Amino acid sequence: MPSIVRLSGITVRNLKNVTVEFCPREIVLFTGVSGSGKSSLAFNTIYAAGRKRYITTLPSFFATRIHSLPDPAVKKVEGLSPTVAVKQNFFAQHVHATVGSTTEINSYLALLFSLDGQAYDPITLRPLTLYSKEKILAEIAAIPDGTQLTLLAPLPAGDILRVRECLRQGFTKILIDGEISPIHKFLATGVPVPSQLIIDTLIKNASNTPRLKVSLFTTLDIGHGECCLHFDNQKRVFSTQTTLPETQNTYTPLSPDLFSSHSHKDRCPQCHGSGIFVSINDPSIIQQNLSIEKNCCPFAGSCSILLYKTIYQSLADNLGFSLSTPWQDLSPEIQHIFLYGKEGLSLPVKLFDGTLGKTTQTHKQWKGVLNEIGEKIRFANKPSRYLPKGTSYTECPRCQKTGLSDYANAAKWHGKSFADLQQMSLQELFIFLNQLPPKDPAIEEVIQGLKARLAMLIDLGLPYLSPERSVNTLSGGEQERTALAKHLGAELMGVTYVLDEPSIGLHPQDTYKLMDVIKKLRDQGNTILLVEHDEQMISLADRVIDVGPGAGIFGGEVVFNGTPKEFLANSHSLTAQYLRQEQQIPIPAKRQTSLGSITLSRANKHNLKNLTVSIPLGQLTVVTGVSGSGKSSLINDTLVPCVEEFIEQGSCPNLAVQGKLSRLVHINRDLPGRSQRSISLTYIKAFDELRQLFAEQPRCKPLGLTKSHFSFNTPLGACSECGGLGSITAMDNQDSITCPSCSGKRFLPQVLEIRYKNKTIADILEMTAYEAESFFLDQPSIHNKIQALCTLGLQYLPLGRPLYSLSGGEIQRLKLACELSNPVKHPTLYVLDEPTTGLHTHDVKQLIHVLQSLTDQGHSVVIIEHNMHVVKIADYVLELGPEGGNKGGCLIASCSPEELIHKHTPTSLALRPFLSQHQELPHLPDLRQQPPIPAAIIITNAHHHNLKHIDVSIPRYALTTVTGPSASGKHSLVFDVLHAAGNISYAELFPPYIRQALIKKTPLPSVDKVIGLSPVIAIEKNSAKNSSHSVASALEISDMLEELFTQIGRPYSPVSGDLLKEVSPQTIAEELLENYAQGYVTITIPFPPEEDFFSYTQEMLREGFLKLYANEQLYDLEGPFPDCLESPALVIHHVKILEKNIPSILSSLSLAFSKSSSIRLHIENYGITTSKTYQLGLQDSLGNSFPSNDNTTHLCPFCHGNGSLSTFSILPYKNRFAEHTPLSLFTSLFPNQDPTPIYPLLEELGIPSIALFQEMDDHSFQKLCLGTLQNPGFDALCTKAMLAHPTTNFPTYLISETPCNQCQGNGTYTYEHCTRIHDISLSDIYQSDVPFLKKFLLSLGKDLPLVSDIFQKLELLERVGLSQVILGQEQSSLSDGERYQLLLAKAFSSGLTDVIYLLEDPLAGIHPKDAPSLLSVIKDLVANHNTVVVTDREGSLSKHADHVIHLGPEPGPNGGYLLETSAFRDLQPISQSTYISDQIPKLSVSVLTSAIQIDNLSIPLRSLSTISGVSGSGKTTLLLEGIYKSGCAMLEKDPSLFSEIIFLDSHPQPASSRSDISTYFDIAPSLRNFFSSLTQAKALNISASMFSPNTKQGQCSDCWGLGYQLIDRAFYAMEKRSCPTCGGFRVQPLVQEVVYEGKHFGQLLQSSLNEVAKDFSFLKKVQKPLQTLIANGLGYLPLGQNMSSLSLSEKIAIKITKYLFLPPKHPTLFLLDGVATSLDNQQKYTLLSQLKTLVSLGHTVVIIENHPAFSQYADFLIQMGHKTDKTSSRIIFSGINQSPSLSNKLE
């Protein structure tokens, strides 16, 4: 393990360039006063850094589903492992947030119902069994032999044609009314009643099995999927249909979605999934004589609000009624739809989008106004708040509160419905699961996962909760532990967990249970970071990091970092002083005297046992007790509603008050809005007064500034660039940067001109409460509210700090401060729920002082609390218990704290030390001996694919190689077992939707157990080659560069070349004043063209606008208007252009831009009217506008960010289309396109429309393709047609990608590649390589943080061998080796520790010169305390490994064993090279590009040529751009030298789930024909097509001919299970009756190629492909082996076999790119021998390969390298291999 984790230079929020260190596998306690920076350090720095680094290495489909954090402001991160956060979980307060949903118990149960549940018809309650043909056969097979069976098919009444057809097919009898009758009686009339056609009667025995199958299938065919079986006086009905005949309802199999009330489909149709139903009790609340337009329904949104008016009008248009129709005249159907909605009703609605500045159309699902109210109730903590008078809500009578559909509610699992299991306690559910009999392994895994989750909740003291329990009824402690159980159940090690005050709300008795869980997590090998205030938790910690010394700007420093004992002995921080009792919270010398009492009777909410409780008035009462004992139920759910009723109505039946009580203040755990626009000052209601104070300043009136201008939430005052947020998001990155326009001040410049006491409003928002308190001494109203913040310890808080950035403790005190800032004299009851949440002991002391001051004023305070400091100062204590849940709810103590400690209750034990005169110091043990972490990853009984139940031990923090022949099980062990297990384990830490995304393509591994896992990063060779992203983007270099250019780059116009200037309200106002002073300006915005003119004018009138500009004159907005209005525009302002009017102009411009993206100014100056249009962004001196560099429209509009354009061309392929005419080819390629544009071109060139291409001379054909000045060419017309239908598939050789001329290939808008730093643009960088960028960055200085980060990435690219790759090059254009090296660089760049890296043959195909550098990178990974496991086909890496695992001894079935030594065999040399004479024809190749410059290279034909060279030297470019294109040209001119070009790369052939070896090599048809010729097949009338698992007639209908079933286990990995119906044989049972040599066709498909070749030696047609496959070492493969299930080396070997071992008879040019890299040494030897054989047959082979053996035995050598200046590639050597060594063997 690394000795230390170190983060240095941290400047996040208030942290002052701190450095923090800790050791792995420690429990680190972050402490300090509230607001000191603990959360900023733990979460915003350490967690953010670890998560960002790990997620960027994961597949993009997962990374994009998590909102990745921006990089924290930290200079260096060392030794950090992947991080997982468990934050404070304030669950949504609505009825759908339940214990079951938040802990995923519901998800487990839903999955079990879908996998193993029994479906029932909800009407008839009849069990539903969805049969397949094979399942029906299985049912019949259970009937004893010798039983007479009669099969019948249903026959409908009155169908004469059906009767005649049955008679024609030979059927003679029917069963009608229980009697058998001849069918011919009903030829004329049809059967009078529904009857049954008798298909067959037979005795069940082995000899009749084929007959039974044929008869059954016939019955199902005639009965349209339904069959009736009579036997032994019994009747069974089978159906393959999902429609129940009795009800005509159609059902689908049970799925997890059915059991989620969040699903938009299959919810309860009455309550729409909420489980509640809102009804109208008083019909008079709807005024019958009023219309909807006149607001007849008071509980519906008012039509005076544009939003509701728009929606209601759309509803009226859709249903065909008028909003002005009185309610009583509307039809009952429309009334019902208005109130309760209609399923599937979607309304088109036009609404104004402020972000776009225009009206856009959207669609709204209409649920009905009462259901909308129901939705609000569902999400509300207090439903009564949203319930209108005259209405009520109840549990939905249809779904009984579940919110599920009737079908889901009717389902059963082991006799229990979903609702039954929801109502059990967690303990009862755990016992129920333990009593179940053993299940299928897949189901058992889900049950074990559910039991583990339940056990965790039970261990955390929550056995009494039920899954259906709403979270909003839980106490704070219960909520927190519910959240913890969700995260702490994984068994990973090497993870850094960051926990946010996990002890919040826990009783001291419960805290010890939590500590045991955290210790267990640490002992598994993880690092635990705790942000904590609980003094008990220090005894748990291995290290204490104290952040302070104060809060806010007075904190942000690490004041201590060491062991708890050292902390207690040496630290002078407030935390240590309180622990040493140098500072204390004093016990009151005298308790307050009671001023009366509140007596609450018959309290029975939830688990309360009908309590009667008396609470004294005028005192501070603490309600305490273990978690779940009923405290929240007593106070929040019972006392508070009763007191509210008493105050409102003067009495309450369950409440008796003796004394004075006239007011209630309930401060609960609900969080205020956390919008970026909500700040502390707005919450305490001081911002309005501050704005009014500024609006009253003398300068405001002449400048036209009002109170509204001093708000950053209105367009009048907010900065137009950032919208008043103070920051913007740059270049589509989530990182926010300070707004360059307002410098983070939020306001417009004219607003900031106003000052109060020489301070602007922005200056005041940056003040702390401490500074503001003295500043506003002369403003009592503002001062008192700010003073309340200081009183509660929030003096460090900036007044403008957004609420979303406050900690939990700060939120609690802010809410109390808001109340204290408005003191009242009326006797008030203050009810607080755990107010010490998140507070340091010093802050608790201040809070207690405030609470005591309330009782001093005669008020009463009731607190739910566990903090013993608060309990000890209470005047009166109520304790509930004795335990939680059903064992709680009793009042076990009601007395003073001094009396309580003499009782025997959980709280008394915890309170005694706090009331003792000499409180003991926390017990801190000596330095702990941590349990040893597993030294290895242990894999037990791995039997995936061909692994032979092996047990493997892989040492941690070491380099392990797995060697062996191809297909010996290396990939199965490393990727299919180890990677899958790690992937699934890590996914457990995330919510189901993220987990499903991560493991969707991860099949369940066949292994008993894998222990010692850490997070896994896997890099495989067969990764997709379709990424259009650049090389620079892979390592986020492009993001960093774009941020760098955003910060210090200067934009220039691509048109004029001059520096672009920004267009903003400020620049427009300056331009007006400079050029048009003393004139008049009319500021207008165009009328939205999609808006109704009349409606829009009325809307604008309501907003206060008065004028309209059109026809170059002004009109009143009320009208009248002329018949024709040209370019109507709304007038925002008309004003004289004077210096004093600039603030007014600025405000008007800002308002205009807030309503429209484009504005138009009409300027009158000296009698001349000038009109100008402006858009926000950038502009050059010629008036050309460009989007600003923070605008999302920065993608090039021509290539849409791709950087390249697709072009279509047939010019090089005249001979391929020789027999086509231009029209016939166009219409065949583009059948839906009009060919008319071709005619003018043909007419101009004088080419007849019926002329074939072969009839045209070369000049005419070229003209036709390229076109003329007047008419576009055929290629251009095809390109246009192709772009019109981009999804159409075309031959790839006809399409080429060319760089976009508009953006020079970088995909950005034209001005962006004109943004420059030192005359260098992004475009210049993206067209260059690593050395160029490093030189450029050095010119900027490495002191810039971004520059330093980019340098690290560039150095890694150099180390993996990619220094010469162009940074802007698309990843898809890289060679296979380069792409793999890039993936390695991406994974290595994270800098994480404790990660398991899985690499697939990293040195394969690498040039020997590149290998040492790449090996050093891998070694560095291990040195950084990671575990690296590598597959090594060649064994070249094993000599450098710390541990080697040998698998073998053979490929395929004879492999998969664990060996003691290597299974590699010595290989024999092959024949020498071919003599190349001068007479052998040669292929002349020239490539002259910026990347490679080769002129007149001559490659001999009929020989073997190799191309080798270091990475990035241009090998693939030479092969494709040079040799391939030159070969195509030679093929056109002289086909005699070779008649075909075959190109093969290292990627396997694409294969579907149905493609197998028998179909790929066309072996299956001959075998199917043979089987169909057998006597049994003819007797059963089985044709050849029925022997195919790919036809409907032949395939097993349960698995569709695949032989396996994929079991979708929702948030678990998919399970691939052998089909139980066909036994995995793929073909239907009837086909399996035909047997040859003891095997039916399904068994034949499972036979090896060796066996098939032997058994069918007489079938000459199949022998050649079979013998070729066997010769290539693939004889062990099954004939029906699915192509997609083969290993990479097997796929490549298959590909090689098809194209190289079964070559064309005519001379062919073979171009091979890295095909040998995935082969082991034996396969390389076989390939080399075959290549020599091909040459001897007259073929030509050119192969890219760095393995020395290929160069030794080649006829012609080409060695690639870089020019001395490294600007491009060149040939270092090319020539005949003069003396190849024949004695050397493959290494």
UniProtKB/Swiss-Prot annotation:
Example GO BP: nucleotide-excision repair
Boundaries of every ABC transporter domain copy: 300-574, 594-912, 1254-1474
NCBIfam families xref list: PRK00635.1 (NF001885), uvra (TIGR00630)
Positions of ATP 4 binding: G1509, V1510, S1511, G1512, S1513, G1514, K1515, T1516
InterPro entries noted in UniProt: ABC_transporter-like_ATP-bd, ABC_transporter-like_CS, ATP_grasp_subdomain_1, P-loop_NTPase, UvrA, UvrA_DNA-bd, UvrA_inter
Protein name according to UniProt: UvrABC system protein A
Record-level Gene Ontology MF annotations: ATP binding; ATP hydrolysis activity; DNA binding; nuclease activity; zinc ion binding
Domain of life: Bacteria
Subunit structure: Forms a heterotetramer with UvrB during the search for lesions.
Keywords recorded for this protein, A-Z: ATP-binding, Cytoplasm, DNA damage, DNA excision, DNA repair, DNA-binding, Excision nuclease, Metal-binding, Nucleotide-binding, Repeat, SOS response, Zinc, Zinc-finger
PANTHER family the UniProt entry points to: UVRABC SYSTEM PROTEIN A
Subcellular location: Cytoplasm
PROSITE patterns, per database record: ABC_TRANSPORTER_1, ABC_TRANSPORTER_2
One Pfam family here: UvrA_DNA-bind
Species of provenance: Chlamydia muridarum (strain MoPn / Nigg)
